[in-house]
Structure formats: C-alpha cells, structure tokens
Amino acid sequence: MKKIGHLMKYLIVSGDSNTTADFDSISHPDMDFSYKKWPELLAEKLGMKVINVARSGQGNEFIYTTLRDEIVKIEDKSQIGLVIAAWSQAPRKDYKQEENPSFRQPWPWSSIRIDTHGNLPYWVQRSLGYYLNFQILCERYNIPYVQFQMIELFEHYLQGILPDPIDVHFGADPNSQSKYPGNKKKDEGSILKMILEYEKKLDTSKFMGWPPVKKLGGWRFRDQLDIWYDNNSPRRVSPLDCHPNGLGHIAICDKINILLQEYKIIKE
C-alpha cells in the first residue's frame, strides 16, 4: 500500500477515450459502460487513490495540461504516488473555452480531430515537446512518473484517415480513406529522424515502448493487446467499436502493472 501515514497517495492519469472514466459509444448508446476503467483498477492494485482526468477525443495538449494542473494543485507533492501520461494522436487539436456565466458548460475542453493549422511533422514535433515538458515537470517536483503512447502518434494520418465512429454513424462509408496531403516519404523520414533526436532529451527508461513507432523498433500500447486489432476480441466493446470493454480494461490494467515492474517504475 502506498500511504502517507493513514492517507493513500494519488495516482494521476490522463489520456483519451481508452482511459476516460466517462466513456460512451455512439455505436451503442444503450450499452452500460459503468464498469471500472484501467486507471481505477490500477490504483486499487497499487493501493492508491485515482485522479483520472482523461477525456474522449482529446489530444496531447489536453493530456499534458490536465496532468500539470492536477500536479500543481496538490500542495504536498509527497502525496503523489505516480503520474501516468497515456498519449494520444499528434494531429488532434485541443482548445479550452472560458466559462460563460450565462451558459454553464459541463466541461471547458473541446478538440478537433485534425488541426487546421500546420502539418504532420509540426504536429509530431509539438507532441514530442509535450513528452519532454511532462518529464521536466515531474522531475522538477521529484514525482514518480511514466509515459507511453497509448495509440498511434501519426501513422494513421500518414496512411490516410478513415471516418471516425461519429461520421460512420451519420452515414459515412467506413472504408473511405483520405489521401495524405503532403510528401509521404519525405515527411515520414523527417518525423522518424525527429523522434530519434528526442531520444537524447528524454529519459527513455520512463517512457514505456520507446521509441513509440514500430518502424524504429518500439511500440505503442495498442500493440500489446488484441483489443484494437481483432474485431472479435472478447475484450473490446464490439466489432464496430474498438474501445476496451470491462474485460479489456482489466487486461490493460494487468499489462500496465507488469510493465511498471519491468521498467522498475514500481517495485514488485
């Protein structure tokens, strides 16, 4: 048990729809998703109290910013047992709207799937910066931390974007695929070089799967389980929805717990 006297330490986690406690599915609006998600399950294994600020559809600016805000909010940093960043896709653009007194929003953050400014190499560079910012922040306060790329960072955009579940729900052809707008070979080479250069700046012993690209010999967390690849996996919501179900979140929790021990983030 990770405790301060009689108090449990905090496990702080941020990510996207594969991590949020408030997941729902447009493909299955009547399905019950009230089961425990992996951050809560992991906190129970580690004897910690979870703070899960993940939200569906969000990108890496959101993930970094919400983790930073939770960390600085806690005055006694010794109360923080572990912080986990489960990174999302680089092209996503996050933005925050100030609360309007005449219209109370339940959540100030929103996002768009593809940023309308910049290009793929820039978006990846921006995400690499968030990796580094997160590391520097945790080192500044001497907080135990780990990070990993939960889903693909950029490859999906390079290969051509498929419609998201919302588009498919409203009639888009699920097999239609957009064409990459840039020079695919040149941009991929630039991105891979950029990622390798960041290896000199990051503490990769605390970045599980580094480098987060299969072509460079690393992995994304989605490569570790069949949830995202096998349409008939018993651990995903359905063939239509590749998100983890209750069994999937248990599998994610168990795998992360094993990796935390392998990377010596926590003791066995």
Located regions from the model:
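Alpha-helical cap/lid subdomain in secreted, periplasmic
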Residues: I4-G5, R68-E268
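Serine-esterase "nucleophile elbow" of acetyl-processing enzymes
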Residues: G5-T66, K73, A251
